[in-house]
Amino acid sequence: MTYDFRAEIVKAKNTGSAKSGSHHWLLQRITAIILVLCSLWLLYFTLANKNSDVNIIIWELKRPINLIPLLIAVITSLYHAMLGMQVVIEDYISCNKLRNTLIIAVKLFSILTIVAFIVAVFYRG
């Protein structure tokens, strides 16, 4: 049986640090606060229009006062989810190729979904 008598710091050296952990943590908290505010707006909007016709709701959502919070909510929620999935993938997937592929896939999915949502909102067909 072999023993490794090196100090723990030596074992941990050069194993790779994200170097952006605090920035990532801060972004998650900021997006969470924005999502709480957008959820309050969504709750108000839903209660204010609970007996409205679908056409009235669509007309209301096209107004800038309602469209801007909706855009912020969707974009922020997708970005928040992307950050969270990235952390989970980095923490639990040990194979570098698979980890990098999954992170790229999550980012690509988020970006494509955000672009599709923006196009759908502003498309006047």
Curated annotation (Swiss-Prot):
Subcellular location: Cell inner membrane
Record bears the keyword Coiled coil: no
Cofactor note: The heme is bound between the two transmembrane subunits.
Binding site for a ubiquinone: 92
Pathway this chain belongs to: Carbohydrate metabolism; tricarboxylic acid cycle
Entry-linked SUPFAM superfamilies: Fumarate reductase respiratory complex transmembrane subunits
Cofactor: heme
Pfam families to which the protein is assigned, alphabetical: Sdh_cyt
Main localization, broad class: membrane
Residues that span the membrane, as ranges: 25-45, 68-89, 100-123
Coiled coil (UniProt feature): none
Binding-site residues for heme, renumbered to this chain: 80
Periplasmic side: 46-67
Cytoplasmic-side segments: 1-24, 90-99
Keywords tagged on the record: Cell inner membrane, Cell membrane, Electron transport, Heme, Iron, Membrane, Metal-binding, Transmembrane, Transmembrane helix, Transport, Tricarboxylic acid cycle
Membrane topology according to the record: Multi-pass membrane protein
GO biological process terms on file: cytochrome complex assembly; tricarboxylic acid cycle
PANTHER family linked to this entry: SUCCINATE DEHYDROGENASE HYDROPHOBIC MEMBRANE ANCHOR SUBUNIT (PTHR38689:SF1)
Known role: Membrane-anchoring subunit of succinate dehydrogenase (SDH).
Subunit record text: Part of an enzyme complex containing four subunits: a flavoprotein, an iron-sulfur protein, plus two membrane-anchoring proteins, SdhC and SdhD.
Protein name in the entry: Succinate dehydrogenase hydrophobic membrane anchor subunit
Source organism of this protein record: Rickettsia bellii (strain RML369-C)
